[in-house]
Swiss-Prot record:
Organism expressing this protein natively: Mycobacterium tuberculosis (strain ATCC 25618 / H37Rv)
Lineage: superkingdom: Bacteria
Subunit structure comment from the entry: Interacts transiently with the RNA polymerase catalytic core formed by RpoA, RpoB, RpoC and RpoZ (2 alpha, 1 beta, 1 beta' and 1 omega subunit) to form the RNA polymerase holoenzyme that can initiate transcription.
Gene induction: The most abundant of the sigma factor transcripts, it is expressed in exponential phase; repressed by detergent (7-fold), heat shock (9-fold, 45 degrees Celsius) and in stationary phase. Not autoregulated.
Protein's recorded name: ECF RNA polymerase sigma factor SigC
Record-linked Pfam families: Sigma70_r2, Sigma70_r4_2
Consequence of gene disruption: No effect on growth in culture, or in isolated macrophages; infected guinea pigs have a highly attenuated infection with few granulomas and no necrotic centers.
Region spans: Sigma-70 factor domain-2: 30-94
Length: 185
């Protein structure tokens, strides 16, 4: 699901209401953002950890929501928290032996798909996984989650121009990895 400006405004309004102690607004805020957070952390880390990382993201967000002041959209604020959760997780995982290898693409699709569609998904997922972390993060934030370049820059803590160049490099890398036959259909 790609976020629209009206979606972001509604989610931000829910977060502001939750910051004032409205439990129903907090519940609605979590429901409205849970899928985006899960997909973001699944791509940045691995599917096996996505549920735990999503939960940790929301635990941190709930603790910090009384201080949320809407300087950015609530979605941007939440994805920045998710990014920090993933970074903490990666630091922890690097300190011990790794037992799993990346995301399993079959967990990233909904329902039954045709075999070719599944093969395409596996190929694209593998190509995205081969991007640098910075490129993958910028591409996912702007192209999958639909954040503006400015919001993606806020999540990543870097200038907008850096996000633009990371997305451009990611697209170039994906096109270079694609086989010529795939480009012509």
């Amino acid at each position: 699901m790609t976020a629209t400006a009206s979606d972001d405004e509604a989610v931000t309004a829910l977060a502001l209401s939750a910051a004032k102690g409205n439990g129903r607004a907090l519940e609605a805020f979590i429901k409205a953002t849970q899928q985006d957070v899960w997909r973001f952390v699944a791509y940045l880390s691995d599917v096996g950890s996505a549920d735990d990382l999503t939960q940790e993201t929301f635990l941190r967000a709930i603790g910090a929501i009384p201080r949320f002041s809407a300087r950015s959209s609530a979605r941007t604020w939440l994805l920045a928290i998710a990014r920090h959760v993933v970074a903490d997780h990666i630091r922890h995982v690097r300190s011990r032996p790794r037992t799993t290898r990346g995301a399993r693409p079959e967990h990233l699709i909904d329902g039954d798909r045709h075999a070719r569609g599944f093969e395409d998904l596996v190929e694209v997922t593998t190509m995205i996984a081969d991007l640098t972390t910075d490129q993958r993060e910028a591409l996912l934030l702007t192209q999958l989650l639909g954040l503006s370049y400015a919001d993606a820059a806020a999540v990543c803590g870097c200038p907008v121009g850096t996000i633009r160049s990371r997305v451009a490099r990611a697209r170039d890398a994906l096109l270079a990895d694609a086989e010529p036959d795939d480009l012509t259909g």
